[in-house]
């Protein structure tokens, strides 16, 4: 693939920071956005905490009709895409619509709207013979995962590759990766790529409660998410969305766009092992890392920072540490590796794209965001996890990795423009 892909715009809706500037302030300051859930009464849940977005759709330009027909996760994506397009200085009306794509990821789609409408049509969940007359006319559009990509495409005029990606917690990374391939292989010149999820709802929270994946530290929410720490006890649910404008390099140059960085490599593999279990050796994640590095024509020793999946579960953090050491060798011990989930929670399908935006900003600022709440070392997690405080560092190439229920293992490599765009 000879066509090179660059990032020219970013947009983000995240807990504690809507807009790239506020999002970066949160990360650089090492602050956490976890609080007791306010979107519904969580009293009957094991985990009653989450990282919510302080989100008013009308304050971000969404009209009443859009709010009625779109679930919260689609609203996040529309706001993030609008910011990314503005940031890129991209006039979508002047682009060839057949050469502009929209690839968006989600893990749970419109679960919140589906829950809400089920209560309406079933007399509060008491009847199976539902009353269809009570269903909202926008229900299908609101909950169907396909709506995410189609709504962004419709709003911004993209008629090229339009796709919703749903690969669990790697959906955001994979959406960015699939958009990368669409441009690199010549099927598009521009792609709006990212992901969005709003999983802080009773049924989704209950799903993760049932398998004890989420943290029960309800009495100390700000310190509940502690990836790689020996006392970690599960992840904190989050929500949000992030979108990047990806362009073919010469297309970006022709319109005089500023370039953040190059998306230089991407790979994804499955472990064919278990729905939630991970192999201790991290072979599949290591293979994704190695393949993404090969695509970027880089070696493990070229990586200056690893943005970890770092969910804060016991098995994930061991698995990921092993994978990074397998791929980077001794260089892993000299490479900072941090998890922003410690600050913004785990927004399932959205987090991969949110983390890619964090990597873009890390390259732009030459700063590594910290792992908040990391205090007690785990002998099996023995790398440099950037405890509690951001760190200035020369960054030229960064790696972002993700792991998803179902065995998905993905990796993206980003390089600063001064390294490769001469």
Swiss-Prot record:
Ranges for domain Ketosynthase family 3 (KS3): 2-416
Alphabetized GO MF terms: 3-oxoacyl-[acyl-carrier-protein] synthase activity
Pfam families named among the record's database cross-references: ketoacyl-synt, Ketoacyl-synt_C
Keyword RNA-binding attributed: no
UniProt cross-references to SUPFAM superfamilies, sorted A to Z: Thiolase-like
Family: Belongs to the thiolase-like superfamily. Beta-ketoacyl-ACP synthases family.
Protein name, as recorded: Putative polyketide beta-ketoacyl synthase 1
The species this protein was found in: Streptomyces halstedii
């Amino acid at each position: 693939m000879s066509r090179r892909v660059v990032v020219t715009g970013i947009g983000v809706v995240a807990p504690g920071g809507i807009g790239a500037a506020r999002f970066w302030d949160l990360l650089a300051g090492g602050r956490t956005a976890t609080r007791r859930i306010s979107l519904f009464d969580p009293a009957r849940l094991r985990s009653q905490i989450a990282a919510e977005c302080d989100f008013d759709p009308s304050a971000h330009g969404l009209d009443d009709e859009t709010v009625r027909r779109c679930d919260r996760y689609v609203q996040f994506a529309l706001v993030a895409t609008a910011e990314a397009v503005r940031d890129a200085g991209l006039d979508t009306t002047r682009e060839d619509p057949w050469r502009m794509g929209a690839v968006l990821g989600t893990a749970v789609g419109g679960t919140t709207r589906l829950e809400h409408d089920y209560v309406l049509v079933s007399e509060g969940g008491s009847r199976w013979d539902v009353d269809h007359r009570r269903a909202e006319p926008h229900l299908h559009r609101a909950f169907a995962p396909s709506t995410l990509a189609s709504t962004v495409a419709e709003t911004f005029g993209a008629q090229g590759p339009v796709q919703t990606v749903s690969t669990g917690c790697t959906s955001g990374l994979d959406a960015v990766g699939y958009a990368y391939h669409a441009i690199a292989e010549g099927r598009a010149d521009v792609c709006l790529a990212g992901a969005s999820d709003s999983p802080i709802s009773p049924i989704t929270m209950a799903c993760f409660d049932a398998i004890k994946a989420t943290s029960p530290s309800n009495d100390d929410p700000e310190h509940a998410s502690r990836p790689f720490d020996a006392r970690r006890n599960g992840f904190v649910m989050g929500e949000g969305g992030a979108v990047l404008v990806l362009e073919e390099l010469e297309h970006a140059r022709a319109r005089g766009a500023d370039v953040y960085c190059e998306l230089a490599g991407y790979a994804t593999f499955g472990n064919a092992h278990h729905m939630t279990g991970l192999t201790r050796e991290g072979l599949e994640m290591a293979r994704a890392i190695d393949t993404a590095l090969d695509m970027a024509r880089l070696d493990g020793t070229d990586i200056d920072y690893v943005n970890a999946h770092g969910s804060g579960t016991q098995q994930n953090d061991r698995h990921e540490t092993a994978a990074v050491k397998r791929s980077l060798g001794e260089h892993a011990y000299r490479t900072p590796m941090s998890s922003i989930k410690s600050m913004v929670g785990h927004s399932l399908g959205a987090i991969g794209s949110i983390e890619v935006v964090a990597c873009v900003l890390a390259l732009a600022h030459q700063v590594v965001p910290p792992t908040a709440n990391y205090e007690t070392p785990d002998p099996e997690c023995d790398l440099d996890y950037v405890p509690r405080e951001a760190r200035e560092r020369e960054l030229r190439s960064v790696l972002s990795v993700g792991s998803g229920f179902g065995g998905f293992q993905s990796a993206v490599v980003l390089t600063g423009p001064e390294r490769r765009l001469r």
